[in-house]
């Protein structure tokens, strides 16, 4: 299996890539039936041309790319909805209907710029599924915690632990 992870340098992406590498390299033997041949890491600094190559070859997409703390609220829609649109259009261009999982947030239920951008990305993914028949999954993260977590940035748990 070839897996594309977008947002691979972010907190969740970095942790996922490490877990996938452990599975691929047989350091984690909890899923013996899962065979990972390649992990395509794509982030904001990756050569843009590689997205097309990765979308042509991948068997599963974890879209973890997004914007959560922009300087301007307009960046939410560009980073969360805009990139999801580019990703799905690129998969369509290659006729690749592999499963796609998109990371979202419980904020998607709220009417604020961040929530609206996450909800727009979710809706786009559902439209993509209807159009292509691809299996899609939305995971709304309520809170995150783990290796590389930063207090006062991306985790209430890390902030709490830091403050005691």
Question: Each predicted region: which residue ranges?
Answer:
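N-terminal Rossmann NAD(P)H-binding glycine-rich loop of SDR-like oxidoreductase domains
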Residues: 1-26
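SDR active-site strand-loop-helix element
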Residues: 6, 61-65, 100-105, 139-141
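Short-chain dehydrogenase/reductase
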Residues: 10, 77-81, 111-119, 150-155
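Adenosine-cofactor binding site in Rossmann-like domains, unifying the SAM/SAH pocket
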Residues: 25-53
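NAD(P)H-binding glycine-rich loop region in Rossmannoid oxidoreductase-like domains
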Residues: 43-86, 90-94, 107-111
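Active-site segment of SDR-like NAD(P)-dependent oxidoreductases
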Residues: 68, 106-109, 142-149
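Conserved Rossmann-fold NAD(P)-dependent oxidoreductase catalytic core, especially the SDR/UDP-sugar
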Residues: 85-139
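NAD(P)-dependent short-chain dehydrogenase/reductase
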Residues: 126-138, 142-164
């Amino acid at each position: 299996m070839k897996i594309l992870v977008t947002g691979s340098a972010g907190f969740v992406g970095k942790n996922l890539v490490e877990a996938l590498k452990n599975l691929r390299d047989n350091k984690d033997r909890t899923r013996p039936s899962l065979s990972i041949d390649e992990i395509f890491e794509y982030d904001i600094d990756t050569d843009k041309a590689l997205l097309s190559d990765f979308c042509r070859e991948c068997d599963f997409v974890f879209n973890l790319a997004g914007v959560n703390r922009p300087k301007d609220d307009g960046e939410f829609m560009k980073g969360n909805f805009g990139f999801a649109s580019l990703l799905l259009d690129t998969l369509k261009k290659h006729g690749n209907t592999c499963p796609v999982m998109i990371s979202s947030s419980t904020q998607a239920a709220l009417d604020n710029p961040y929530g609206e951008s996450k909800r727009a990305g979710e809706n786009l993914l559902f439209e993509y599924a209807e159009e292509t028949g691809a299996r899609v999954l939305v995971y709304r993260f309520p809170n995150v915690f783990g290796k590389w977590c930063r207090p006062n940035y991306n985790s209430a748990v890390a902030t709490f632990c830091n403050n005691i």
